């Protein structure tokens, strides 16, 4: 008995969506006049490709390694050396909560790994551009693997002899970010990087498409251990605030944030979930109690308005601030900095000799009041913040009070730090979590991206014959790698912001991506 499907014009819905998926373009089912219903074969009567998915020899555990990085576990059913079916994690008890093991079921990207493996568009044999043709003409001829290896090796030797090892660069955007051996991130941790280190090194990169600023800024505020509470701890939160975090679009799988948020909503229904985001995201629609729209890149001003309100109203724990913060009060700089023992070379407030470099008039207290170095900027009241952020002053006060009625978890996505002031945005979001006493407690967190629990696994770094040190001294921003190809001769300290290691051993990092650094 066939199933009935509504058709649109002369194309059935099934065919229409199949065509859209095949062409890789987004389409909308609007403006199509429905035609008469037609009989369409049932899904279970369609011919299977690659053999019977229930007839297999072995089952092997694998993982989805696309660029979201969630690494959802997958089971591969194999028959005669061919994958006949991909299945999700359905083993064990599915218990969500702190210390519990829950099933990490992949999204559609993981479930379609078999189609990816056997895609007719996948290049499975070496191809060489036809002699005499130009790049972009798309004319290739098949060659053997031995020919390909010899051609690549010969070309690499010629490049090294003429230009040196800094003419080699490893681009990380390969589409297999999460692989264990085939991983592409971080380039320094890949097998190819180890090979290049054996052969003299390569041009390195710093920063990345995702976390160019937050990666450097969070350790300056929270120290080296800045990871957030594990996501399952959200069942202990009274309030959950998401800044620029939309996992319904970015991390929707069973081992990622969106599924976990839905579980938190089910198990902790009394929790108030607030989404601070310029647009009404799918996450805000799906799980939030409240959406607070904000002008992009103004998170720092929002937090300043919140803290000024709490501070002026006497709602903050002053002793906590004096004990745990450096630079909030103008009268506590010297003692705080002298008592601090930097755990890394990237410590704000110290010069080459270890002396204090921050002027007392630049305290956060002075910034909030508009005094000292900030004279003339005005007091950072909720009304001031409202004019910058577009968030009403009363809403700013309500959000601030929410933090004092904790425990309140703060989780920021990577959108707030993708601005010219992104470093300050990311630190400000972490600051509102810390200054309200929500760090280091169950149901709270550091204000970074959601924390995850994981199991360590062996990596190529454990292989003793592969040296980890890259002897090439130049490191270029991954944003600027194209310039190193087109005209590396103009990349100097004046035009591309070169930084060099100084006599104290402290490496100077630019806050914003897009500069060149010598190390």
Feature locations, PLM:
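N-terminal export/assembly segments and adjacent metallocofactor-ligating motifs
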Residues: 2-316, 324, 328-332, 336, ...
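Beta-strand segments within the central parallel beta-sheet cores of soluble alpha/beta enzyme folds
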Residues: 57-58, 169-171, 397-398, 444-449
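Acidic/polar loop patches that form or flank catalytic/metal-binding clefts of enzymes
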Residues: 85, 204-205, 316-321, 395-396, ...
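Structured, non-membrane catalytic/scaffold regions adjacent to prosthetic-group chemistry
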Residues: 138-148, 154, 389-405, 409
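Non-catalytic, well-ordered alpha-helical scaffold segments
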Residues: 193, 300, 304, 397, ...
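Glycine-centered helix-boundary capping/hinge motifs
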Residues: 200, 389-390, 437
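Long, well-ordered, tryptophan-enriched scaffold segments
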Residues: 267, 272, 279-405
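A glycine-rich, hydrophobic/aromatic-adjacent loop/helix-cap motif
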Residues: 377, 383, 399, 403-519
């Amino acid at each position: 008995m066939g199933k009935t499907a509504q058709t649109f014009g002369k194309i059935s819905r099934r065919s229409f969506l199949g065509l859209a998926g095949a062409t890789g373009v987004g389409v909308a089912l609007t403006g199509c006049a429905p035609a008469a219903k037609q009989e369409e074969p049932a899904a279970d009567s369609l011919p299977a490709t690659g053999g019977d998915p229930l007839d297999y020899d072995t089952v092997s555990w694998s993982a989805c390694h696309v660029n979201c990085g969630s690494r959802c576990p997958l089971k591969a059913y194999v028959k005669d050396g061919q994958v006949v079916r991909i299945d999700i994690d359905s083993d064990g008890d599915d218990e969500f909560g702190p210390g519990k093991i829950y099933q990490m079921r992949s999204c559609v990207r993981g479930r379609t790994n078999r189609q990816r493996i056997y895609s007719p568009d996948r290049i499975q044999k070496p191809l060489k551009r036809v002699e005499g043709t130009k790049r972009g003409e798309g004319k290739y001829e098949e060659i053997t693997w031995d020919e390909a290896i010899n051609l690549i090796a010969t070309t690499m030797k010629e490049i090294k002899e003429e230009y040196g090892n800094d003419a080699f660069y490893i681009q990380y955007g390969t589409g297999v970010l999460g692989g264990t051996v085939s991983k592409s991130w971080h380039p320094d941790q890949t097998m190819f990087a180890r090979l290049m280190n054996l052969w003299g090194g390569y041009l390195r990169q710093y920063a990345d498409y995702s976390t160019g600023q937050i990666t450097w800024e969070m350790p300056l505020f929270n120290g080296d251990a800045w990871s957030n509470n594990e996501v399952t701890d959200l069942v202990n939160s009274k309030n959950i605030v998401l800044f620029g975090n939309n996992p319904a679009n970015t991390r929707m799988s069973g081992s990622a944030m969106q599924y976990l948020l839905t579980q938190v909503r089910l198990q902790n229904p009394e929790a108030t979930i607030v989404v601070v985001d310029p647009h009404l995201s799918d996450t805000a629609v799906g799980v939030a109690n409240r959406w607070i729209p904000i002008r992009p890149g103004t998170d720092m001003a929002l937090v300043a308005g919140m803290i000024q309100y709490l501070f002026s109203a006497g709602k903050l724990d002053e002793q906590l601030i004096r004990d745990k913060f450096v630079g909030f009060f103008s009268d506590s700089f010297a003692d705080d900095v002298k008592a601090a023992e930097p755990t890394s070379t990237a410590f704000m407030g110290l010069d080459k000799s270890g002396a204090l470099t921050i002027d007392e008039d630049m305290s956060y207290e002075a910034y909030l009041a508009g005094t000292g170095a900030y004279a003339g900027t005005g007091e950072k009241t909720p009304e001031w913040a409202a004019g910058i952020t577009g968030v009403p002053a009363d809403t700013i006060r309500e959000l601030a009070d929410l933090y004092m009625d904790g425990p309140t978890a703060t989780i920021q996505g990577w959108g707030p730090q993708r601005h010219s002031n992104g470093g300050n945005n990311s630190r400000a979001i972490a600051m509102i979590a810390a200054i309200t006493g929500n760090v280091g407690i169950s149901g709270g967190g550091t204000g970074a991206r959601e924390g995850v629990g994981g199991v360590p696994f062996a990596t190529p770094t454990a292989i003793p014959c592969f040296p980890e040190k890259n002897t090439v001294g130049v490191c270029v921003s991954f944003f600027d790698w194209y310039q190193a190809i087109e005209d590396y001769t103009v990349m100097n300290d004046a035009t591309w912001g070169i930084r060099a290691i100084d006599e104290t051993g402290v490496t100077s990092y630019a806050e914003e991506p897009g500069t060149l650094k010598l190390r």
